[in-house]
Amino acid sequence: MYRICRLVCIIPITVSLLLFSCAYFNTFYNAERYYEEADRIRLEKSGKAIPLKAMDNYGKTIQKCRVVLSEFPESKLVNDAILLMAKAQFYRSEYDDAIGNLKIIYSKGSAKQIAEAQYWSAVCKWKKGKTQAALDELKDIIKSSDDSVIKAQCHLSLADISDELGRAEDFLFHLEEGAKQLKIGQKEESFTISSLTLHLIMRATR
C-alpha cells in the first residue's frame, strides 16, 4: 500500500517535469526554426536589403527566446537562447541590445559560446562604425579559438570588412582562409556551416 501511495505521488511530479521540459524545448526549437528560415530568406537575397519576411522571422526568434529566458530561467538552453536572440538582433540592426546580451555569455558560457559571443560582438561593433575595433577583435578570436567554424566566420567577416575598405589582397586572403576552416569544419554537419558555405560561394563569385 505504501509503495502504491509513493507511486501515485511520484507520477504527477514526473508528468510535470516532462511537460516543463517539453515546453522549453519546443519554445527554443521554434525560435531556431524562425531564425533558420530568416537566414535562408536573407541569403537568397544577399547583397540587397534584408526582406521584410526575414526581418519578421528574426523578430519572432527574439520573442521566442525571451519566453525561454523569462519562463524557463533555469533551463540548460538559456545561454543558447541568449546567443540566438543576439544574432537575430544583429540582423535587425539592434546592435546595442545584441552587445548587451552577449556580455552575459562572457561570464556564464562555455568556451565555444564565449568565442561565438565575442564574434557577434565584434561584427556588431563593425556595423556601428567601430571598424578597427572589429578588425582587432576578429583577429584575436582567430588566434585564441580552436573552433574551425568560429574561425571561418571571423575570416569571412574580415573578408567583408576588407572588401568594404577596398583592400583586395586582404579580401582574397581571408576568403581563402575562411574556405580552409570550413573544409576542416565539414566534419560538423550544421546549419551554420551550410549558411557559411553559401556565403563563401557568393563572396567568391562577386
Identify what each model region corresponds to.
Residues 1-12:
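Bacterial N-terminal signal peptides that target proteins for export
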Residues 17-206:
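Acidic, polar-rich low-complexity tracts and alpha-helical solenoid repeat scaffolds
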